[in-house]
């Protein structure tokens, strides 16, 4: 159980407060010796400090992105090349990778299959055995609202 009595503070001798106690004097010597022996410049610590030194070296080798000036090269316009562009930017006439020649582009569009959105849904009436279809009940294409305004495609 805990008692509620007041405890007397420990009495320390005057020589201990003055650090004249022989048991504590060696601590000052150890701390001085430790400071002399430790040289942080000789051995870098492993971990973050080593990476930081490597980053400093790599920063010196190549400039940061914000330090490099942006080179403005005018956009490619097919068939338009002047002597000024060729001399100033050392540009050679070439076709961009992402864009095709317009003539080839049109033929590719014709050969592509239509998207699912563009194809009409075929409506087949339910099959009933022994029943013949009337002329009005032939299979027909259901045309979406967008297509009703324009061309109607039936398959």
From Swiss-Prot:
Keyword Phosphoprotein appears in the UniProt entry: yes
- PTM remark: Substrate for cGMP-dependent protein kinase. Phosphorylated by PRKG1 isoform alpha. Phosphorylation of Thr-68 and Thr-119 is required for its phosphatase activity. Substrate for cGMP-dependent protein kinase.
Tissues expressing the protein: Highly expressed in cerebellum.
Asked whether the UniProt record includes Phosphoprotein among its keywords, one would answer yes
Positions where Phosphothreonine occurs in the chain = 68, 119
Q: Which cysteines are joined by disulfide bonds?
A: none
Q: Name one GO biological process term.
A: regulation of phosphatase activity
Give the keywords, sorted: Phosphoprotein, Protein phosphatase inhibitor
Task: Spell out the InterPro entries in the cross-references.
Answer: PPP1R17
Q: Where is this region: Disordered?
A: 41-73
User: Where are stretches of biased composition, namely Basic and acidic residues?
Assistant: 58-69
Q: Give the coiled coil ranges.
A: none
Gene Ontology terms for molecular function: protein serine/threonine phosphatase inhibitor activity
- Function statement: Inhibits phosphatase activities of protein phosphatase 1 (PP1) and protein phosphatase 2A (PP2A) complexes.
**Could you identify this protein by its name?**
Protein phosphatase 1 regulatory subunit 17
Taxonomic lineage is: Eukaryota, Metazoa, Chordata, Craniata, Vertebrata
- Coding gene? PPP1R17
